[in-house]
């Protein structure tokens, strides 16, 4: 139950790379139904995100693996090296 509470608290947070550049806003969290583990974050990319353009993210919504998350506070920080246009 704690995982779901944390997931609800994370929704709507801004997502930044570990280089301090904004990617977008967290809109959903995908959880494995069997294990209950968080698998991916669904992020709505900001239209003016320079980081997204540099990485090659052209879709409006992208899946970012939860393993890329390095910190969560007022914002979510993800490791840019683990985010790719192939997600």
Language-model features and meaning:
Residues 1-87:
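Peripheral interaction segments used for macromolecular assembly
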């Amino acid at each position: 139950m704690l995982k779901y509470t944390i997931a609800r608290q994370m929704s709507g947070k801004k997502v930044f790379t570990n280089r301090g550049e904004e990617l977008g806003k967290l809109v959903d969290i995908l959880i494995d139904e069997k294990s209950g583990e968080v698998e991916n974050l669904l992020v709505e990319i900001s239209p003016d995100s320079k980081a997204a353009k540099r990485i090659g993210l052209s879709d409006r919504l992208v899946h970012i693996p939860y393993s890329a998350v390095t910190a969560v506070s007022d914002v979510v920080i993800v490791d840019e090296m683990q985010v790719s246009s192939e997600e």
